[in-house]
């Protein structure tokens, strides 16, 4: 049975990358990211997100191929704009592909895609994926120029990078980054885009972001994997989904930069 708490209020995409990281750390076949994905669906995940990196540091090609036909919800495949990755995506045909920047030396994705600076390349990738029947999302910073460029690329979806909000060291810095994200959501909607968000969100900073009414979906992975060490995998997924839904439905949480 798949559990859904208030379906349609706000979607949770559970990223399974770091289940694969744990598997690969010892070169074993466990923990199985496929099993993690299916159990996440049962616990209320609205989609499964996974990033096939060029160096295959966590998710592998076989994981993507094995998972695609087993999902009851939908697959959101993150990948870089390379001919290899685009060809793999067009072969496997996930429901969604989120195009992300990628550097081999980074620990995790460090910022948004520079759509404005690589407009022709991004546009071509969007066309290739759309022609294959795949919905395209662009992972970008909450920057007006990048949002406008994403709309011009004919990408129907953007995912706003929340890393700077999540990594803020002071209350003032976090409040400023929250305002940037909120403004980015509003700008995306004005361009007619579906607006998602993610990166660095966890159990004590997700509430203000989840409360923003213009956000359709949040993609969260590392925090859920980490919390599962103590709470159990399905409990961790259920708890995150419940927090997000409560925030969207009006439960009062502190908003960065506003009085409690």
Swiss-Prot record:
* Identification of the protein by name: Pyridoxine 5'-phosphate synthase
Q: How does it assemble?
A: Homooctamer; tetramer of dimers.
Subcellular location(s) of the protein: Cytoplasm
Q: Does the keyword Protease apply?
A: no
Enzyme Commission number, as recorded: 2.6.99.2
Extract the HAMAP family matched here: PdxJ
The UniProt record gives the binding positions of 1-deoxy-D-xylulose 5-phosphate as 17-18, 53, 58, 108
């Amino acid at each position: 049975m798949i559990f859904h708490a208030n379906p349609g209020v706000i979607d949770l995409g559970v990223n399974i990358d770091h289940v694969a990281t744990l598997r690969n750390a010892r070169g074993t076949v466990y923990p199985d990211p496929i099993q993690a994905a299916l159990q996440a669906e049962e616990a209320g995940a609205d989609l499964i997100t996974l990033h096939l990196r060029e160096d295959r540091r966590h998710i592998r090609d076989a994981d993507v191929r094995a998972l695609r036909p087993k999902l009851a919800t939908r697959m959101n495949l993150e990948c870089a704009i390379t001919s290899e990755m685009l060809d793999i995506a067009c072969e496997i045909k996930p429901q969604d592909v989120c195009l992300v920047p990628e550097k081999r030396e980074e620990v995790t994705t460090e910022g948004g895609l520079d759509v404005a600076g690589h407009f022709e390349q991004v546009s071509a990738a969007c066309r290739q994926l759309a022609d294959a029947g795949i919905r395209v999302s662009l992972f970008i910073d909450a920057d007006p120029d990048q949002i406008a460029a994403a709309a011009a690329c004919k990408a129907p979806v953007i995912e706003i990078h929340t890393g700077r909000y999540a990594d803020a060291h002071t209350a003032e810095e976090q409040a400023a980054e929250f305002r940037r994200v909120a403004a980015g959501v509003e700008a995306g909607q004005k361009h007619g885009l579906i607006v998602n968000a993610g990166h660095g969100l966890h159990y004590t900073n997700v509430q203000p972001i989840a409360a923003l009414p213009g956000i359709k979906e949040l993609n969260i992975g590392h925090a859920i994997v980490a919390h599962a060490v103590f709470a159990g995998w399905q409990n961790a997924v259920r708890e995150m989904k419940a927090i997000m839904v409560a925030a969207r439905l009006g439960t009062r949480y502190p908003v960065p930069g506003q009085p409690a």
